[in-house]
Amino acid sequence: NKRTVEALIKAGAFDRLHLDRATLLASIDLAFDYALAQEANTHQVGLFDLTDDGHGSSTQEPALAEATPWDLRERLQQEKAALGFHLSGHLFDACANEVRRFVQTPLAHLEESREPQLLAGIVCDLRIINGNRGKLALFRLDDGSATVEASADESVFSGNTALKEDALLVAQGRVQFDRFSGALRLNAQNIIDLPTARHRFGKHLLVQIGPLAASEPGPSFSRVFSDHPPQRTTTDSGDVLMRGLPVRVRLGIRSNDGSIVEGTLALNEDCQFYPSDAALASWTALLPQGQVHVVYSGS
């Protein structure tokens, strides 16, 4: 049953055979076709099928299909689709290193304060209820260190796509002690997703190239800029704002004598992009050796 095998692959049951679950999932049809062919040939031994030991020779096993490996987030989401929960890690781990550059406080170290605080975590148990003042979103934020109950008024989440189950949410609001639950509770006043946080807190994207030979061409970025342009937003007064992240290139050139000269170039304002996950994946595909990252204030 292909569906059963698919679920087992997503859950990691075949990890000891092959660690790349995406490749295994893409190879299911090949595996079943090969198994059916083997079964059909089991009792059909011809004159030219006999080997030295008298047994029927099998057809050659097909190579595994090619597939893009899953990142941590995709792997955990596939586990939840198969099992109903994340088995091999926490969703926050997929973005923890980046998020901690602009949200330093783990939820385990959260303290009550009248001043608004900036928090980040994965949205869990999201539900919308009808309150006395309109709709109210109730959810939990979980960053792997702890969880905190949270709420957001309709004016905060209405028309905002950031509030989704299993999504990374950056929330600003007041944290107060809830006598009913006996724990801290967040009243979110502003919520954004990770791409918006990159634009808001990031200074620029740093792209490291080289060292290259003096005559060696560098990679072309034009496709990334055309596929992921800055987002246009219109203010209440009619002004058009561009939401994009600038790019800086750190370039190394190797001269004929072997010495290396390095310099950093700031691309012009036309060379900006919206820092979505897909955009960063495109940058990483161009420079896969960890040569691309968002630079945040203070880093």
Model region roles, listed by residue range:
Residues 12, 43-49, 84, 134, ...:
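Glycine-centered flexibility motif
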Residues 18-19, 87-201, 211-223, 229-243, ...:
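Single-stranded nucleic-acid-binding OB-fold domains
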Residues 1-112, 176, 187-189, 205, ...:
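Sliding clamp-binding short linear motifs
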Residues 47, 79, 83, 121, ...:
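A residue-level signal for conserved active-site and pocket-lining positions in enzyme catalytic cores
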Residues 190, 198-299:
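C-terminal effector modules of nucleic-acid-centric enzymes and ribosome-associated factors
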Residues 3, 78, 118, 274, ...:
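Charged, alpha-helix-enriched surfaces in structured cytosolic catalytic cores
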Residues 68-71, 75, 87, 161, ...:
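Catalytic cores of large soluble enzymes that bind and process phosphate-bearing ligands
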